Amino acid sequence: MMIDTIESQIEDVITCSLARYLNSNTLYLKSRTIRYNGGRQSGHTTTMIELLKRYPNSLGLVNTHSIAMRIGKTYPDINNRIFSWVSFPCAFLGSRSRFNMVIIDDMHRMSKDDEKLLDIEILISPVMTHDEPFVLIKLQ
C-alpha cells in the first residue's frame, strides 16, 4: 500500500471523526491496522498522533511507558502531551485545566477507577469488541 493512500485514509478518519465530535461530547472511533511495505502501522495510534499534532490543548494516553517514550522521541512537538496509563492519574488530574480534549488509545483497558477519575461513563458501541482498538475523544 502506498504511503499517500495511508495518509489519505488517516485524513478521512480525522475529518469524519471531527465532524461527529462537534455534535457530541464523546466520540468512539473504530480503526484498523494498516499494512504496508511488509510491515504494520497501527491506524488508531497514528490517528491519535495526528490529532495531538493538530490540537495543542489535547492530551494523549497510551498503553505503556515505552510506547509513550517512543512516540515522544519521534514527535518531540507532542512529547509533553502523551502519557502512559501508569502515569495517567497524576498526568491528567495535574494538568486538567490545560487540556480540553483527551485522546485515549485502547480505551477498553480502562478500569472503573480510571472512569471515575475522568468523570465519564464508558459506553461501548455494540459494533465494537474488546479485540478492536479504538480511540475515545472526550471534551472536558
What kind of region is each of these model predictions?
Residues L61, M101-I103:
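Structural motif
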Residues I3, Y21-L22, T64, P76, ...:
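Short, structured coil/loop segments at alpha-helix boundaries
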